[in-house]
């Protein structure tokens, strides 16, 4: 390391090296070192490391491609519905754009999955049963967008012949969240403006992985869109929660500094009953923050007493003035 000029150091997956927090800290203390550290799980920012580097690092969260990035990467802006179909049936991982056939994509996603499950989760967490972990993964993938508790997951899986207790479910889900394979979204009491401790939702980092895991039964347009919108809000650096308004649910409460926005997500609201159901929870919120219904319907933007119905694809592309 030179003393009279900057030295740029890049570490990838350094969490696999013993005593790596001490290595990072010692280098970070040197005034002529600019240090970049990447890691594929939340252990990189565990309390021990955060304490060592307190106030001296900037965290940049990385995600697979957003829909807009995918469209730009595939040069498919002339047909957004087809681009969206490709986005959810192939994958949002950048490398898959270079792959020609669906079988090649499945092979690649299988490799990603095995790396996360076997090398990252099973090895580091020392979980005892890879088959049970895979059962939890498939159950979670099949229930994206559903309100869940670890007890309910344990009860349903046990009833289906895969006996598992609540503590084991908690341990496995925690491991999945730490590797960013799954994201947990907590509930937020809109009226009381506080987080609730129970009954959140889970979303996958990539819908292509869901299709790989579940096959032909993976297609549920509404829940897939909900997962995609959740990831888009993360791309926009929002803190995202599931909203609770009395007995009603708001799909997403997105908070950014002092700004709040509310979202309902549905594949279509052309049926009047569906539209009224999606409007109902938003109409109960008595504040002036923006409220949206995002849908795949290719209809002009509409306004229902301040609640905007917007095409989700145009919203993700940033083409809609909100």
Give the positions of each predicted feature.
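Structural recognition of the conserved hydrophobic beta-strand(s) that form the central parallel beta-sheet
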Residues: 10, 34-40, 61
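Active-site ExK catalytic segment of metal-dependent nucleases
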Residues: 260-270, 278
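Nucleic-acid nuclease catalytic cores
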Residues: 245, 286-306
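Accessory nucleic acid-recognition modules appended to NTPase machines
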Residues: 101-260
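Conserved P-loop NTPase "ATPase switch" module shared by AAA+ and STAND
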Residues: 2-20
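Interdomain motor-coupling "hinge/lid" segment immediately C-terminal to the ATP-binding subdomain
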Residues: 40-42, 46-147, 180-183
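Conserved Walker B catalytic segment
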Residues: 14-37
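Domain-level recognition of nuclease-like catalytic cores that cleave nucleotide substrates
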Residues: 298-322
């Amino acid at each position: 390391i030179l003393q009279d000029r900057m030295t740029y150091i890049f570490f990838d997956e350094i969490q696999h090296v013993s005593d790596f927090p001490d290595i990072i800290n010692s280098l970070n203390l040197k005034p002529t070192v600019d240090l970049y550290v990447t890691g594929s799980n939340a252990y990189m920012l565990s309390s021990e490391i955060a304490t060592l580097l307190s106030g001296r690092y900037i965290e940049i969260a990385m995600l697979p491609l957003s829909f807009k990035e995918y469209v730009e990467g595939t040069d498919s802006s002339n047909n957004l519905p087809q681009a969206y179909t490709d986005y959810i049936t192939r994958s949002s991982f950048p490398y898959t754009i270079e792959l020609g056939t669906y079988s090649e994509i499945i092979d690649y996603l299988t490799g990603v999955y095995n790396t996360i499950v076997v090398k990252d989760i099973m090895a580091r967490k020392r979980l005892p049963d890879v088959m049970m972990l895979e059962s939890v993964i498939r159950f979670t993938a099949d229930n994206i967008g559903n309100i869940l508790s670890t007890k309910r997951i344990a009860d349903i899986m046990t009833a289906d012949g895969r006996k598992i207790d609540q503590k084991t479910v908690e341990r496995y889900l925690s491991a999945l969240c730490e590797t960013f394979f799954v994201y947990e979204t907590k509930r937020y009491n809109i009226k009381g403006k506080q987080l609730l401790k129970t009954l959140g939702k889970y979303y996958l980092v990539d819908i292509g992985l869901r299709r790989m895991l579940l096959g032909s039964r993976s297609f549920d347009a509404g829940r897939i869109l909900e997962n995609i919108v959740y990831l888009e809000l993360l791309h926009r650096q929002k803190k995202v929660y599931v909203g609770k308004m009395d007995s009603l649910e708001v799909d997403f409460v997105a908070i950014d500094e002092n700004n709040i926005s509310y979202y309902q997500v549905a594949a279509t609201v052309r049926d009047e009953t569906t539209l009224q159901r999606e409007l109902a929870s938003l109409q109960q919120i008595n504040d002036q923050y923006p409220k949206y219904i995002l849908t795949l319907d290719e209809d002009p933007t509409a306004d229902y007493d301040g609640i905007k119905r917007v095409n989700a694809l145009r919203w993700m592309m940033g083409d809609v003035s909100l």
